[in-house]
Amino acid sequence: MVESLSLLEGSWIIKGTDFPMWASKKRKNPMITYKKISNNPTKFLDTVKYETKSKSKQIDGIDTYSTTKFIWRGKGILKVLKSEWSILVLTERILVIRFERSLVTPAGIDILVRDNVEVDDPKQFILESLKDGILKKEEIECLIWL
């Protein structure tokens, strides 16, 4: 897995999710950017950007890969928060992540498409791209498509 983590770098647009923060649609256009920190292939700056009715917002953290999962730690005032997440699918065009329940968030799934990839029907594109068995039928049915 460490060898393929270079594919993670770049900006990704959340297209499908069951995470309440995005599913409520009060926060729009969620995007996550991963940038490798120094020469460490297992540590990334994680920047989440989104829009509310009145302004753009940003959440910054550091992701550190450890064996089979990432450990996210917030930056600044969010430094006290941490969460764990894992990659289910990582290609040049699609990223599917599963995040564990944390102190302030429920467990869930995000399905992302790389920022520069044009997709007419994100749901169809993603469902056709997923390997059988990556997500359970009930997990797919719970997704909200943004």
Can you annotate each of these PLM segments?
Residues 1-146:
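A beta-rich soluble binding module of mature secreted/lumenal proteins
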